[in-house]
């Protein structure tokens, strides 16, 4: 009986915890983004070996956010975390032109997974504060995003260190998740 009332309460007040994965190649800024979202400031990070998991509350929605390491040796284990994922934040280093093809390959492989079929995709074109950064449009084309017909997606111009673009991206994600319920 208590479970019934708590589920009604949750549906009325939006307290269901959403599962979000933050994925991308190593050095893209995933961990910086996670802690910027959680504590609102830049924290010193080291390369993630394995994962970081934190609860982030944004606009009355609770997110269980999983930041998975992006090194070549860790990427095959991403699939172990796909189950019950509501959205993927895919972070791309806008300055890393040499690895945009690898980033695309990882993104395509991930999106082919059945467990992520219904997950919303948010791409963070990160490090936009750098002069040599690709534009979000250039990145979207390089990643093949316009070809995604059966998936809700959006790309945002972000800088994890400056905090720019994160609110817009999270606002879009929250509204998109709410419209699905």
From Swiss-Prot:
One Gene Ontology molecular-function label: GTP binding
Positions of GTP binding: 24-31, 45-48, 70, 126-129, 160-161
Similarity section: Belongs to the small GTPase superfamily. Arf family.
Subcellular location: Golgi apparatus membrane; Golgi apparatus, trans-Golgi network membrane; Membrane
Membrane topology note: Peripheral membrane protein; Lipid-anchor
Keywords: Golgi apparatus, GTP-binding, Lipoprotein, Magnesium, Membrane, Metal-binding, Myristate, Nucleotide-binding
Record-given protein name: ADP-ribosylation factor-like protein 1
SUPFAM superfamilies named in the record: P-loop containing nucleoside triphosphate hydrolases
InterPro entries, per database record: P-loop_NTPase, Small_GTP-bd, Small_GTPase_ARF, Small_GTPase_ARF/SAR
Keyword Transferase found: no
SMART domains: ARF, RAB, SAR
Residues annotated to bind Mg(2+): 31, 48
Record's GO cellular component terms: cytoplasm; cytosol; Golgi apparatus; Golgi membrane; trans-Golgi network
GO terms under biological process: Golgi organization; intracellular protein transport; protein localization to Golgi apparatus; retrograde transport, endosome to Golgi; toxin metabolic process; vesicle-mediated transport
Known partners and oligomeric status: The GTP-bound form interacts with GOLGA1. The GTP-bound form interacts with GOLGA4 and RGPD8. The GTP-bound form directly interacts with ARFIP2. Binds to SCOC, preferentially in its GTP-bound form. May interact with UNC119. Interacts with ARFIP1; this interaction directs ARFIP1 to the trans-Golgi membranes. Interacts with ARFGEF1 (via N-terminus).
Lineage of the organism: Eukaryota, Metazoa, Chordata, Craniata, Vertebrata
Function per UniProt: GTP-binding protein that recruits several effectors, such as golgins, arfaptins and Arf-GEFs to the trans-Golgi network, and modulates their functions at the Golgi complex. Plays thereby a role in a wide range of fundamental cellular processes, including cell polarity, innate immunity, or protein secretion mediated by arfaptins, which were shown to play a role in maintaining insulin secretion from pancreatic beta cells.
Source organism per UniProt: Bos taurus
Main location, first listed in the record: Golgi
PANTHER family per UniProt: ADP RIBOSYLATION FACTOR-RELATED
Pfam families assigned: Arf
Keyword Metal-binding (UniProt): yes
Gene: ARL1
Lipidation (N-myristoyl glycine): 2
